[in-house]
């Protein structure tokens, strides 16, 4: 399973937001692109991937929303459609930290921070990496674990208090890339390592 922990430092964790102004809603447009890159193929949904977005912009406590490809149905690639799924989740009361409550098929939510996600991953045997320009080259990883997770930040660098635990950093090159591009590169690299490179459109 490939897992992506996506940080949304300014996206609302409760209440509502306008589908007509996703950039002004804590850059929800970028978050939706990340989800699309993590889960969608040209003609289907990846059943080997999940994405957890961490909504940290308040009001109230942080909320995590999990999209599981293997259970997902009807996810469309446009940002507005994905944002609508997230907005529906925000209408629900926030579950306790560590308790995942399903809102619709393939989509569930829970309280908690990025540190909670890393703890859950560790409990499940997931090996986690942070995507960072200053990390080791992606090609330096030769033995890919069956369950692997990647942390994807937004415009704000991930700091030690966010992570709560030490984690190895991997670089995709010298330039800062959009999160959605990083996720696509990781998928292509993993597909290639498995002998099944992602086809060109």
Describe the predicted segments one by one.
Residues 110-114, 131-139, 147-158:
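Long, charge-patterned amphipathic alpha-helical coiled-coil/hairpin "stalk" segments used as oligomerization
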Residues 129, 139-143, 151-153, 162-166, ...:
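Structured N-terminal alpha/beta-domain signature
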Residues 156-201:
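Structured adenosyl-cofactor binding patch, chiefly the S-adenosyl-L-methionine
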Residues 1-132:
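RNA substrate-binding interface of SAM-dependent RNA methyltransferases
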Residues 16, 63, 139-141, 160-161:
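Short glycine-/acidic-enriched loop or helix-start segments at secondary-structure transitions
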Residues 120-123, 139-145:
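A short acidic-Thr-Gly-centered motif at the start of a beta-strand
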Residues 19-21, 67, 143-146, 164-166:
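Short, glycine/charged-enriched secondary-structure capping and boundary segments
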Residues 33, 149-150, 184-188:
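A generic structural signal for well-ordered alpha-helical surface patches
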């Amino acid at each position: 399973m490939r897992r992506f922990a996506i940080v949304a430092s300014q996206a609302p964790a409760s209440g509502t937001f306008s589908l007509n102004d996703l950039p002004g809603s804590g850059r929800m447009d970028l978050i939706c692109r990340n989800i699309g890159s993590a889960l969608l193929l040209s003609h289907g949904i990846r059943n080997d991937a999940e994405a957890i977005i961490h909504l940290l912009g308040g009001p109230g406590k942080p909320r995590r929303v999990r999209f599981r490809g293997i259970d997902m149905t009807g996810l469309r690639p446009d940002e507005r459609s994905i944002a609508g799924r997230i907005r529906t989740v925000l209408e629900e009361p926030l579950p306790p930290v560590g308790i995942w409550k399903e809102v619709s098929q393939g989509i569930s939510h829970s309280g908690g921070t990025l540190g909670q996600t890393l703890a859950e991953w560790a409990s499940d045997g997931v090996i986690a990496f942070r995507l960072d320009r200053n990390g080791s080259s992606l090609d330096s990883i030769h033995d890919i674990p069956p369950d692997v997770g990647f942390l994807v930040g937004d415009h704000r660098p991930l700091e030690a208090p966010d992570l709560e635990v030490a984690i190895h950093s991997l670089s995709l090159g010298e330039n800062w890339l959009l999160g959605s591009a990083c996720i696509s590169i990781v998928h292509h690299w993993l597909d290639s390592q498995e002998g099944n490179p992602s086809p060109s459109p």
